[in-house]
From Swiss-Prot:
Disulfide bonds: 233-259, 247-274, 291-317, 305-332, 349-375, 363-390, 471-662
Chain sites annotated for binding Ca(2+) 2: 168, 200, 202, 204
The protein's name in its UniProt record: 72 kDa type IV collagenase
Gene that encodes the chain: Mmp2
Taxonomic lineage from the root: Eukaryota, Metazoa, Chordata, Craniata, Vertebrata
Reactions that this protein is recorded to catalyse: Cleavage of gelatin type I and collagen types IV, V, VII, X. Cleaves the collagen-like sequence Pro-Gln-Gly-|-Ile-Ala-Gly-Gln
Residue segments, region Collagenase-like 1: 110-221
Length: 662
């Protein structure tokens, strides 16, 4: 097969291509007008969204969900998510409604959960009926097996897979209306749903194949051939001094897409070819043979993969030149630049492409009001109007499946935002089942016999993390900061938010909902108001965000900020409105950072005791509220208020009563 070419084919035009791409990447086009893309779903108005949301998840009938009923039901929804119960469609409520989530209702729905059912046996079978083209079958199998193990680890339930016949849990992927009367809604929105234990559809779990299914951190691409066959692409990877976040044909004369399986290709030389129909197909009856172009189907010649003849939207091709004669076919694998949504049924991006007369060498948000990045799937959008959204981080099939299998065991949605069974999707890198989840499933089935310590044998059971309650517990916050006008309180993987001190903050919410790449626990946080960027510290690294987008190249070591190597942790940091400088505290010392010059000021560190009146060492947090003229230093359960101009302490108070509304 041609794909087994030696790596030397990369080198010839490499430098010319790289220089050309760099020059094109710096071309600046005039802002493009906002247009209507064919096949795009028009966003609902806030009122339309609310009526549909409350009908689907809170039982408010569409035909009678008038203003009075809507307001009452809206309060129930706000209470469920820990939002202020105003009954109004405020910004926080709309933001919550627009988040990706499970399709099961948040209040009792007897089609899904009649009479709190459970399985009457501990040996449960499951069968995977279909696969998503986003992941190779082995990765899908593993994700589902690990998701079921989440529940078998803490209960007597044991799961076994069958390949034929009727299983207790039938697992499948589908789009829109897929046969159970509960249609999906295209990309984002509803991710999956599952039915409670029982006969028929009981236990069945369905996943929306209009989503991009990954392991939560971008596309999972297993390479073929090369010198790293079967390994996974490493994104981004470094090649000839440039980072690539997707497969590329740069440097190749045959057009095949490739990637490095380590970060530094120049150093390690490990690579493979990305899935492509010219290399192989999946499923079907073509034994994995590559597509044969052109091929004939129903008398028509096709030069690319097609969805013709299918109702499920999957792209396929003939593996011989005449499908009508040989009936040999396979499904086209998703490439690392396959699109999601749009009107191209997953066809890959084509670069460069023309849009409104301008050429684009990469994905763009031009023409869109929602900021989503897209690409054309032909060389000229203006002529062909074929397009799709570019791949993002996608949704973790493991996490979504673990949630849905909780429903398949009989669990309903949890109001605990830290629980796996909370309805809104949030990616968690180091997943642990919460105490709320464990209590819920063990109420139905009891604990795992492997964790029984009554006889002194077996492992000691460990409780999952518990969601803190700020007014019932003495919480020492990891960080406090004013970000985009709101005050955020951080504790482990949770945050609380408010606009005004003394008002009880909204929460708890998961940190990952806003800043998904952060570790489970931070040490300090501040906002650089000049650039409106949030800076987070954890251990000997720091992260910089613009809104919810992590800046490229982060996290970075503290040393790149100008701190000495012996500083392994930052206690607190804040930007002082008095001089627009940032102060960073660690132990009994502090440093001053110039946000304009991007370097530490000379003459630091200094001792806290020598410069700050009555401020203790080893602080927990510092914040300077915009326009307030005061700075607040937090330690333990108390805080000290300093007047910015005189540096006099003007108040010593309780965090609970003065900041949390307790």
């Amino acid at each position: 097969m041609e794909a087994r070419l030696v790596w030397g084919v990369l080198v010839g035009p490499l430098r010319v291509l790289c220089v050309l791409c760099c020059l094109l990447g710096h071309a600046i086009a005039a802002p493009s007008p906002i247009i209507k893309f064919p096949g795009d779903v028009s966003p609902k108005t806030d009122k339309e969204l609310a009526v549909q949301y409350l009908n689907t998840f809170y039982g408010c009938p569409k035909e009678s969900c008038n203003l009075f009923v809507l307001k009452d039901t809206l309060k129930k929804m706000q209470k469920f998510f820990g939002l202020p119960q105003t009954g109004d469609l405020d910004q926080n409520t709309i933001e919550t409604m627009r988040k990706p989530r499970c399709g099961n209702p948040d209040v009792a729905n007897y089609n899904f959960f009649p009479r709190k059912p459970k399985w009457d046996k501990n040996q449960i079978t499951y069968r995977i009926i279909g696969y998503t083209p986003d992941l190779d079958p082995e990765t899908v199998d593993d994700a589902f097996a690990r998701a079921l193990k989440v529940w078998s680890d803490v209960t007597p339930l044991r799961f076994s897979r069958i390949h034929d016949g009727e299983a207790d849990i039938m697992i499948n992927f589908g789009r829109w209306e897929h046969g159970d009367g509960y249609p999906f809604d295209g990309k984002d929105g509803l991710l999956a749903h599952a039915f409670a234990p029982g006969t028929g559809v009981g236990g069945d779990s369905h996943f929306d194949d209009d989503e991009l299914w990954t392991l939560g951190e971008g596309q999972v691409v297993r390479v073929k051939y090369g010198n790293a066959d079967g390994e996974y692409c490493k994104f981004p990877f470094l090649f000839n001094g440039r980072e690539y976040s997707s497969c590329t044909d740069t440097g190749r004369s045959d057009g095949f897409l490739w990637c490095s399986t380590t970060y530094n290709f120049e150093k390690d030389g490990k690579y493979g070819f990305c899935p492509h129909e010219a290399l192989f197909t999946m499923g079907g009856n073509g034994d994995g043979q590559p597509c044969k172009f052109p091929f004939r189907f129903q008398g028509t010649s096709y030069n690319s993969c097609t969805t013709e003849g299918r109702t499920d939207g999957y792209r396929w091709c003939g593996t011989t030149e005449d499908y009508d004669r040989d009936k040999k076919y396979g499904f086209c694998p998703e490439t690392a630049m396959s699109t999601v949504g749009g009107n191209s049924e997953g066809a890959p991006c084509v670069f460069p492409f023309t849009f409104l007369g301008n050429k684009y060498e990469s994905c763009t948000s031009a023409g869109r009001s929602d900021g989503k990045v897209w690409c054309a799937t032909t060389t000229n959008y203006d002529d062909d109007r074929k397009w799709g959204f570019c791949p993002d981080q996608g949704y973790s099939l493991f996490l979504v499946a673990a949630h849905e299998f909780g429903h398949a065991m009989g669990l309903e949605h949890s109001q605990d935002p830290g629980a796996l069974m909370a309805p809104i999707y949030t990616y968690t890198k180091n997943f642990r089942l919460s105490n709320d989840d464990i209590k819920g499933i063990q109420e139905l089935y009891g604990p795992s016999p492997d964790a029984d310590t009554d006889t002194g044998t077996g492992p000691t059971p460990t409780l999952g993390p518990v969601t803190p309650e700020i007014c019932k517990q003495d919480i020492v916050f990891d960080g406090i900061a004013q970000i985009r006008g709101e005050i955020f309180f951080f504790k482990d993987r949770f945050i609380w938010r408010t606009v005004t001190p003394r008002d009880k903050p909204t929460g708890p919410l998961l940190v990952a909902t806003f800043w998904p790449e952060l570790p489970e626990k931070i040490d300090a946080v501040y906002e650089a108001p000049q650039e409106e960027k949030a800076v987070f510290f954890a251990g000997n690294e720091y992260w910089v965000y613009s809104a919810s987008t992590l800046e490229r190249g982060y996290p970075k070591p503290l040393t790149s900020l100008g701190l000495p190597p012996d500083v392994q942790q930052v206690d607190a940091a804040f930007n002082w409105s008095k001089n627009k400088k940032t102060y960073i505290f660690s132990g009994d010392k502090f440093w001053r950072y110039n946000e304009v010059k991007k370097k530490m000021d000379p003459g630091f560190p200094k001792l806290i005791a020598d410069s700050w009146n009555a401020i203790p060492d080893n602080l927990d947090a510092v914040v300077d509220l915009q326009g307030g003229g005061h700075s607040y230093f937090f330690k333990g359960a108390y805080y000290l208020k300093l007047e910015n101009q005189s540096l006099k302490s003007v108040k010593f108070g309780s965090i609970k009563s003065d900041w949390l509304g307790c």
